[in-house]
Amino acid sequence: MRNRNGGVFVRSIAGDFMNGYEFQVYNRCHDGDVNRPVFWATGAIDDRQNARRLVSRDNEWFRMTIVANGPHLASWVNGVQVTDWIDDRKPNVNPRNGLRVEPGVIQLQAHDPATEVEFRRIVIQK
């Protein structure tokens, strides 16, 4: 399958649909250049920081590591760090509107009903 589009939401508000920091799962880049990923490429923090490069490919399992430590959020794909971001916005219970350091739920997303995204071997550490 091509154009798989999904995400992993962290620090989401319990009971609120997909409302947290979203780490993207989308294997696209400009003109086939992995050093020019689209803004929402795999590992990117949606609407906050683009992935530095595209490391993963469609139809291949990959490992994504997400760290959320205070205002610091970062991600690695197959061991390559692709984001490193400090949320310096004013605190807000809603992470779409400001810094949220409170724990929340983790949500897995397939972008729409036609999207097929699979997750396996999920490990959560505190």
Predicted regions: what is each one?
Residues 1-126:
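Carbohydrate-interacting regions of secretory-pathway proteins
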